[in-house]
């Protein structure tokens, strides 16, 4: 049973998260690779990693982790912040990158020496756990609506994501022009 104090803490956390997302989302897109606040929820890494931080359309990611963030941003833009599969796909992408780093014997590094993968990856991974938690709460209050059929087209050349499950949609992707894919995104 959820007590009044626990419920108010959850409500406060959700409010703070949403407020931070709204305030941060009013910023301009990034076309520069940056590394700030590497070990906090206020992280900004590459062009695409961080709450409310996003790259300008057509901007290539700074490294493989930034490519995972770019793919996540594209999914959230289309499906909404409460679509949990976007967050789960991001975690799979980061897990795959982590395994690749371990097998590279230290040769695979991110673009920033100030924010090495050893600090950035756990930070964004833990932040995504919060995203999954708050998405679940958001879906209680605002369940997805069936109906519209948006289509996404993304160049996945650098993202290294697993597209077998349709980026979390369970729909097949149509490949065209090399690494460009498109899919109908039914909820």
Swiss-Prot record:
UniProt remark on cofactor binding: Binds 1 Ca(2+) ion per subunit.
GO biological process, one term: pollen development
GO-annotated molecular function: metal ion binding; phospholipase A2 activity
EC numbers on record: 3.1.1.4
Entry cofactors: Ca(2+)
InterPro entries in the record: PLipase_A2_dom_sf, PLipase_A2_His_AS
Transmembrane segments: none
Positions annotated as active site in the UniProt record: 72
Gene3D superfamilies: Phospholipase A2 domain
GO CC annotation terms, alphabetical: endoplasmic reticulum; extracellular region; Golgi apparatus
Compartments it resides in: Secreted; Golgi apparatus, trans-Golgi network; Endoplasmic reticulum
Disulfide feature: 29-56, 33-62, 38-115, 49-69, 68-93, 75-86
The family this protein is said to belong to: Belongs to the phospholipase A2 family.
Protein name, UniProt field: Phospholipase A2-gamma
Organism: Arabidopsis thaliana (Mouse-ear cress)
This protein's encoding gene: PLA2-GAMMA
């Amino acid at each position: 049973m959820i007590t009044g104090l626990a419920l108010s803490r959850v409500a406060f956390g959700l409010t703070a998260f949403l407020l931070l997302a709204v305030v941060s989302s009013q910023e301009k897109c990034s076309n520069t690779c940056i590394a700030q606040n590497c070990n906090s929820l206020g992280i900004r890494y590459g062009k695409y990693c961080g709450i409310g931080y996003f790259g300008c359309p057509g901007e290539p990611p700074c490294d493989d982790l930034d490519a995972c963030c770019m793919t996540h941003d594209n999914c959230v833009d289309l499906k909404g912040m409460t679509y949990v599969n976007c967050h789960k796909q991001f975690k799979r992408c980061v897990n795959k990158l982590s395994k690749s780093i371990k097998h590279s014997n230290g040769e695979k590094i991110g673009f920033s020496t100030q924010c090495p993968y050893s600090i950035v990856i756990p930070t964004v991974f833990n932040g995504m756990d919060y995203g999954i938690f708050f998405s679940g709460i958001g879906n209680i209050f605002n369940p997805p609506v069936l109906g519209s059929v948006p289509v996404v087209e993304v160049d996945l050349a650098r993202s290294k994501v697993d597209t077998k499950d349709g980026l979390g949609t369970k729909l097949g992707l149509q490949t065209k022009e090399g690494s460009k894919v498109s899919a109908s995104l039914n909820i």
